[in-house]
Amino acid sequence: MGSHRRTVITASTREIEVLTAGNPDGYPWLWIPGSPSAAADYPRLDDLATRLGLRIMTWSRPGYGDSSPRAMPAHGPRISDDIPDIETILDAEGVEEEFIVVGWSGGGPRALACAAMLPERCKAAATLASLAPFDAEGLDWMAGMGPGNVADFAAALEGPEAYGAFKETYFLPMTDASVDDVAAGLAMLLTPSDDVTHSLGLARWLTEMTHRAGVQGEIGARDDGLALVAPWGFDVTSIAVPVAIWAGGQDATVPLAHGKWLAANVPTAVPHLLEDAGHITLINDLEDVLRELLEIK
């Protein structure tokens, strides 16, 4: 039914860029894409939401797209810092009672934060290829990741200044790259099952998200990555909301071990550990993901 882009204002007067699509009167679905990314139109999601009677809400996290950066907290960025922004978005969109949430890749920890910190409103959550907490007990966090991701997270562990310089060097050149260039760059992080060139629409969407993620420079990508390797600000073992954990055995970006750890440590987990799935191909299961959430909420 088409998308609508708007700006909402936080209590601290920051601006948040919000994108909605699907059925405007449908059940609220919060969609949280990966890192780095910004709110971008994807007709496939719009069509899916319309068909399932859902209203999609997504946003550009601080420093991405047209969303104001967040001042660097003394403790550094944390995943839990996004919850007040999510509450602001829900209030602005008139979502007073309940919603479901799906987080993909770097969006997965935010979906888990919704389940942990907004249990009265978040009725069910799903993660697609989500990272586990960096301090996850018993998990070799970087084992099995592609070399690009290992280098990225290693730089994040060096702190904001070093990581900002890393992102300026390696991320910003991608923000004006062509669809073909983005697909080629992703290929270094992905496995054969994740070949994005088979779907021009998907590659265009990923390219637009990447372009818009860098319109303010590297600050959004820097803070996003720092939050992933810092304490998240909540305990996944305290979650009481149903959470579907989707992860793929062919994922070289977020290895299957992360999904297995979440499935074993989120008390309400409903595991979907797919040996043949990759990081990108889990998007193909999104209809099944949403139908399950609507059943278990």
Predicted regions located by residue number:
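The serine-hydrolase catalytic nucleophile loop
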Residues: G34-D47
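Glycine-rich "HGGG/HGxG" loop immediately N-terminal to the catalytic nucleophile
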Residues: Y42, P62-I79
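Conserved alpha/beta-hydrolase
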Residues: A49-P69
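Conserved acidic catalytic loop of the alpha/beta-hydrolase fold
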Residues: D81-F99
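Conserved hydrolase catalytic core segment
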Residues: E98-W141
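Alpha/beta-hydrolase
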Residues: M145-F234
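Short beta-strand/loop motif that positions the catalytic acidic residue
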Residues: I239, I245-A247, D251
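Catalytic active-site module of serine/aspartate enzymes centered on a nucleophile-bearing elbow/loop
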Residues: T268-K297
